[in-house]
Amino acid sequence: GTHVDAPSHYGSVGDYGPPRHIDRMPLDWFLRPAVVLDISDVGVGVVGAERVRQELERLDYHVRPLDIVLFHTGAARHAGTPALFTDFTGLDGSAVDYLLDLGVRVIGTDAWSLDAPVGHMLERYRETG
């Protein structure tokens, strides 16, 4: 099924002020034009702002404030298996910041999470300390 993580799901402090709870999210943000970006070739890991820019350019799509951006990761191929929770593509901070700077307020994915898979995050942590 579908669900929405409000900004407060990710922490209690943000650069833009206190993150909103879901009951404080304007409903009209969820009833806007959307574009689907295909990142299904990436595999396990993350994409950054540059890949998002490339996909928007490939589609010749110019994001307007409050547009919705959806990511097709190909995660559905893992439906019904444990890999659904571990083998997907998330977004790094630069991708999220880029979308927010464009005025995007709703980002969606067909993956289990918008974050990088936990295993990927742990591997990066071991590499960088």
List each language-model region with its residue ranges.
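Active-/binding-site microenvironments in catalytic and ligand-binding cores
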Residues: 1-129
